[in-house]
């Protein structure tokens, strides 16, 4: 359902030697303390193990974190996770996208709750205590039950930590960071003609999610963030607007919009 998967077919991969050189150049020129592997699905990169092993050797002496965002839980490798944790643990990011199995099937996410929980258990067993979960609000056919499912799934993952990791082996308190963005219909995708929620509806959905999280047994272990509704509405206009939008953007610039987030 995401635009990238529709527009950029077929799948193409960067040369692993090129990525290694990029990593070295960026670490030497920026002094950053974390390097991230960013793609639509990092865990599907065919040379991931080789690349991570190289980064381990490169980053260990500099005490640089390695971050693996955009992981598909069903493709996640315990071996890769074990290698990354040898430097410094930051957080792991998973993207269930929806709180219920029904809605995940609607958007063709292809993840079951069993697979999600198994992936989280692997993370906890690997020594991680901080897991980020990405969801989307306002998806086509969404119901209140789907929204509450976000809180329930987050709670199950938090509870899984205590079930998976013995007390004597816990290196810290578990924290689940549940983040929601708002669905924005994009051209050239299966949902390009789907209805987009209003700002008020976005806020209502976010507040419902927050309330549902507060009702969970492990709510103190769950932190909730959501995307700005105002910015999401603007993104919707830009996504489906035509060339007439150019004059609007120019006018906004002339009125002082220079470094605004949108």
Predicted regions and their residues:
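Contiguous mid-protein beta-loop-alpha structural module that forms a pocket-lining wall or clamp
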Residues: 145, 182-186, 199-201, 212
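Acidic, Ser/Thr-rich peripheral helices and adjacent loops at domain boundaries
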Residues: 84, 91, 196-210, 245-257
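Flexible helix-coil linker/hinge segments at domain or subdomain boundaries
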Residues: 162-169, 210-225
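Radical SAM enzyme core and accessory elements
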Residues: 216-262
């Amino acid at each position: 359902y995401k635009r990238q998967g529709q527009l950029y077919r077929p799948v193409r991969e960067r040369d692993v030697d090129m990525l290694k050189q990029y990593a070295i150049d960026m670490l030497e020129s920026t002094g950053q303390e974390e390097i991230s592997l960013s793609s639509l699905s990092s865990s599907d990169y065919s040379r991931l193990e080789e690349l991570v092993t190289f980064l381990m050797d490169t980053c260990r002496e500099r005490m640089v974190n390695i971050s693996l965002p955009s992981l598909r839980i069903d493709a996640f490798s315990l071996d890769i996770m074990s290698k990354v944790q040898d430097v410094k643990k930051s957080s792991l990011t998973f993207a269930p996208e929806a709180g219920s199995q029904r809605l995940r099937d609607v958007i063709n996410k292809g993840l079951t709750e069993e697979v999600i929980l198994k992936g989280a258990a692997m993370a906890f067993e690997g020594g991680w205590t901080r897991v980020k979960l990405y969801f989307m609000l306002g998806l086509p056919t969404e119901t209140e039950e789907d929204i509450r499912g976000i809180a329930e799934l987050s709670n199950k993952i938090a509870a899984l930590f205590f079930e998976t990791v013995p007390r004597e082996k816990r290196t810290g308190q578990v924290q689940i960071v549940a983040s929601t963005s708002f669905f924005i219909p994009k051209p050239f995708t299966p949902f390009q003609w789907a209805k987009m929620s209003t700002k008020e509806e976005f806020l209502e959905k976010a507040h419902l999610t927050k309330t549902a999280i507060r009702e969970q047994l492990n709510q103190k272990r769950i932190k909730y963030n959501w995307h700005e509704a105002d910015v999401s509405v603007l993104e919707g206009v830009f996504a489906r607007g035509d060339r007439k939008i150019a004059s609007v953007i120019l006018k906004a610039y002339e009125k002082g919009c220079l470094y605004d987030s949108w």
